[in-house]
């Protein structure tokens, strides 16, 4: 059922991008054209809801939102790089300590 509701929204967006008017008749024809079972109550609710919405503004905001989130991500990257470098240094120090320990043992056994 939820998928059907999304299908009506997708139809409305397709009509919008095609430059058509989003009204009950156009949505009904589009739904029939793709073989959907028409639910006139859902179509009426969607059209009523969209009358209160400026689709152009909503779509501009939706496109801009991921860009803003992506711009914030690089700021976190240096901290992650520093942490990775610290971990790498710690691992190298541990390896050196192990090598020292092993070299002592190898000296004892003539290796």
From Swiss-Prot:
The keyword Ribosomal protein applies. Disulfide bonds: none annotated. Residues 75-111 are annotated as: Disordered. One of its GO terms (cellular component) is ribonucleoprotein complex. The keyword Ribosomal protein applies. One of its GO terms (biological process) is translational elongation. Signal peptide: none annotated. GO terms for molecular function: structural constituent of ribosome. It comes from the Archaea. Keywords: Ribonucleoprotein, Ribosomal protein. Residues 88-101 have a biased composition (Acidic residues). HAMAP family: Ribosomal_L12_arch. NCBIfam families: ribo_P1_arch (TIGR03685). Belongs to the eukaryotic ribosomal protein P1/P2 family. Forms part of the ribosomal stalk, playing a central role in the interaction of the ribosome with GTP-bound translation factors. Part of the 50S ribosomal subunit. Homodimer, it forms part of the ribosomal stalk which helps the ribosome interact with GTP-bound translation factors. Forms a heptameric uL10/P0(P1)2(P1)2(P1)2 complex, where uL10/P0 forms an elongated spine to which the P1 dimers bind in a sequential fashion. This is Large ribosomal subunit protein P1. The lineage of its organism: Archaea, Thermoproteota, Thermoprotei, Desulfurococcales, Desulfurococcaceae. The gene is rpl12.
């Amino acid at each position: 059922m939820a998928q059907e509701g999304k299908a009506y929204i997708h139809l409305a967006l397709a009509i919008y991008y095609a430059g058509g008017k989003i009204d009950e008749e156009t949505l009904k024809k589009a739904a029939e054209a793709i073989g959907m079972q028409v639910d006139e109550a859902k179509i009426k609710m969607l059209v009523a809801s969209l009358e209160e919405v400026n689709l152009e503004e909503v779509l501009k905001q939706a496109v801009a939102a991921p860009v803003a989130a992506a711009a914030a991500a690089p700021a976190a990257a240096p901290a992650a790089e520093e942490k990775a470098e610290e971990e790498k240094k710690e691992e190298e120090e541990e390896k050196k300590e192990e090598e020292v320990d092993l070299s002592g043992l190898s000296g004892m056994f003539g290796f």
